[in-house]
């Protein structure tokens, strides 16, 4: 059983009631669990045709978030008992970078959930929901050039992949007053 803090309630309220959110808090406060993992699972269960992208400061970190979501669909006995089997069929992709649930009724080139590290290529992709979780880290916030590169990637590569009626939710920790979260 999880202890839900006021911060978690605030994040849940924000992402449930707005198409564009920014939630910042120190490391270790559970932002990712509530605003990333739990939210992705909820959205996928509600709409198996959804296309969600989880972005993080590195590909490895983005894949770790995706793996946590995917593992719930593979091993969470309560989720499987209540909602059934959502794992892959022989035609669906199911790996560390992306997965597609077997309940989809519309053919789409994008997976149900895709993991992408900051500065990764997103050409020809379109997403209904983008979750930027810890896009900013010490490694890309120290210098003006690093901050500028991240902002350029975010606004000219990532943001245009969001569908016109899509949602974008950013979760993170501030590392510099002039970082992406300014």
Task: Label each region the model flagged.
Residues 1-182:
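Short, flexible loop motifs at catalytic/binding sites
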């Amino acid at each position: 059983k999880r202890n839900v803090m006021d911060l978690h309630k605030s994040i849940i309220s924000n992402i449930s009631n707005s198409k564009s959110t920014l939630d910042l808090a120190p490391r270790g406060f559970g932002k990712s669990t509530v605003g990333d993992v739990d939210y992705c699972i909820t959205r996928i269960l509600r709409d198996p045709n959804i296309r969600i992208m989880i972005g993080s400061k590195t590909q490895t970190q983005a894949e770790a978030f995706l793996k946590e979501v995917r593992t719930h669909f593979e091993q969470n006995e309560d989720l499987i008992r209540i909602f059934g089997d959502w794992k892959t069929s022989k035609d669906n992709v199911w790996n560390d970078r992306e997965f597609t649930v077997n309940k989809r009724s519309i053919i789409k080139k994008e997976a149900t959930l895709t993991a992408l590290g900051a500065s990764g290529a997103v050409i020809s992709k379109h997403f209904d929901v983008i979750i930027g979780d810890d896009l900013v880290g010490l490694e890309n916030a120290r210098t003006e050039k690093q901050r500028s590169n991240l902002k350029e990637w975010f606004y000219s590569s990532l943001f245009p992949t969001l569908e016109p009626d899509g949602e974008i939710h950013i979760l993170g920790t501030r590392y510099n007053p002039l970082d992406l979260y300014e």
